């Protein structure tokens, strides 16, 4: 799908998630997705509730290594690993909430505003 001339994509296809997880392991599935789809001037949005997910940390490290633009949105603990490691993020937002309901709503509002 294109939006303002930019490709918009997210890894939500169960068959793609299964294939990437089986072939590369779940911790690297999303990182491999980036290998397939990221182009010049891509913006990767890294969202993690706990901020400790190895698969999201691998995506962040991939973005750092490839100098791909990325932003971070985490919740729960403010001193989470993703937030700490994200040195070159265009933004690094933390939502101070322990409620998954609030978190899901904020993620949805954020994505609606950005995408």
Where are these regions (language model features)?
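Glycine-rich phosphate-binding loops that contact phosphosugars or nucleotide phosphates
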Residues: 1-115
């Amino acid at each position: 799908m294109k939006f303002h001339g930019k490709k918009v994509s997210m890894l939500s296809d169960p068959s793609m998630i299964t294939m990437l997880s089986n072939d590369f392991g779940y911790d690297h599935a999303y990182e491999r997705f980036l290998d397939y789809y990221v182009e010049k001037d891509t913006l990767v949005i890294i969202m993690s509730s706990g901020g400790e997910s190895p698969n999201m940390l691998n995506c962040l490290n991939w973005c750092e290594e490839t100098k791909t633009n990325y932003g971070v949105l985490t919740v729960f603990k403010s001193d989470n690993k993703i937030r700490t490691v994200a040195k070159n993020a265009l933004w690094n937002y933390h939502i101070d909430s322990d409620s998954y309901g609030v978190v899901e709503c904020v993620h949805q509002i954020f994505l609606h505003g950005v995408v």
